[in-house]
Amino acid sequence: MKNIILNNKNKKEIQNYLRKVIEIGLDFKCQERFRTNILEKERYNELLEFPDEGKDILELLEYFKLSILPYCSNFSSINFMGFPDSGNSMSGMVGAILSDLLQQNLINSSFCSPIASFLEIAVIRWLRQLVGYHNNDTIKDIFQVGGIITNGGTGSNATVLLLARENHRSNTMNEGVKNPGEYKVIVPKGIGHYSIRSSLMWLGCGNNIIEVPINEFKYNLKELKRAIRKNKGSIMAVIIYVGDSRTMTIDNIEKICKIVKNEDDNIWIHADACHGFSLAFSSNLKHFIKGINNVDSISIDPHKVLMLPYTLSALLIKDAEKMKLISSNSDLIMQEPFAFGQITPFIGSKSWDSLKLWFLIKNIGIKEIGKIIDRRYNMALFLEKILNASEDFIVINNVKINSVMFMYIKNKKNIEYNIEELNYINKKIKEIIDKEGIYYLHQFSILDNIGKLKKNATIYPLRYMSGNDNIKREDIIKMVRYVRNIAKRVIKFYLEEKRK
């Protein structure tokens, strides 16, 4: 076991092992298929066996390559078209590897991460500048930074609801929630992300979500105003989706801010822009998120939209000093000016995840990232165009970022199937796609809020949403052809069987 701990004597040998690791990982990422094998239940016990004896690292790597890797999902495949989390940027991978090797802990700065803390501050300031938040010329301490890095959008949203709670009823952290009904949060009906409801319950505020009706996947503004007035004094936050996780619809940011602040200036307005913030890089598309600088906070997920390895999210706060509402005091977290541990709830030891984004932005540059976002948007528009031109597919949403929801309907001019049958057909299509493992498209239930098939009927569309910039138009065309061929099989076999 001479090589279990790195030292100067075995450094060369461990370098060879790590080269092998990188080779395995890169070969996997460059596979065309989304998945090679499906894990069978019979293997569960084997995977759960307790390892009494160790194995040689090369033997273990070979076992991993042959027996584990084929069952992994390849988000970097050009055929992975259901989510944008491709994780295949060169500079992002460099940052991820270095972050793990360097072992910096950003809970404190003076000895744990003397320079890492300041590079993380730089990344947060770049993000603030992109969305239009003001940055001070100089910063004296962590409470002037105006944001934190978290490990995902759920962590960012949970933290912001903690902030909203303290802003709504001061000193709740010390005194506790006395009346959960006074801590309500407004979301758009049917498209809210689960993290908001879950976070509200985790924070002891109960399931006090108010769902406001929507028009074309955006707030019905009259109903929003009515909900605020009906619950006057008990609304702690209103959530705006700047690209909801299903349709990528961008809500009316400026109008919502005006309505909310006119009704109650103390209500916290939070923009969940985990996807939509990417448009801030693009001079051509940033007008879609106009007014985002007016909200109290913004959650963003670079790991979703900037080709970064998991995980990296950020929470940006317009008024940086508000972070004092949720600060921690402990002699384990040194009370020094730039210790992030003072303002990162739910996180203790803190890895240098932001290094991935630091490398990516410094390597590619803001302008070039903007061109990548433009291309991604245009690729979604291309798919929308060919689906609209087809006779057998219908697009369910208005494309604004990179989500295209669509359903196979066989014949637009004469739709012979009812909603139940169309849902059955499209769920069977998805089932076969998943079983074959060549492509990945997402699927979920959603109300047909635009009325493409039947207004507010529950439907099960397929969803394309890619952040893999290796994808070309011909790949999109191949995917549509593949789905169409499966659909014809479904129509021929499964639907006939169902009607017996």
Model-derived segments and spans:
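Conserved small-domain helix->loop->beta segment predominantly found in fold-type I
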Residues: 41, 344-350, 354-375, 384-425, ...
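Active-site C-terminal subdomain of aminotransferase-like
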Residues: 290-391, 397
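Short, glycine-/Ser/Thr-/acidic-enriched flexible segments
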Residues: 82, 190-192, 216, 243-245, ...
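N-terminal entrance/gating region of PLP-dependent enzymes' catalytic architecture
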Residues: 1-144, 431-450, 462-471, 478-483
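Short loop-beta-helix segment that forms the pyridoxal 5′-phosphate
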Residues: 128-162, 210-212
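Buried hydrophobic packing segments
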Residues: 98, 120, 124-127, 156-164, ...
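Alpha-helical scaffolding segments of alpha/beta enzyme cores, especially the outer helices
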Residues: 226, 254-259, 382, 424, ...
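Conserved PLP-enzyme active-site core in the AAT-like
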Residues: 156-324
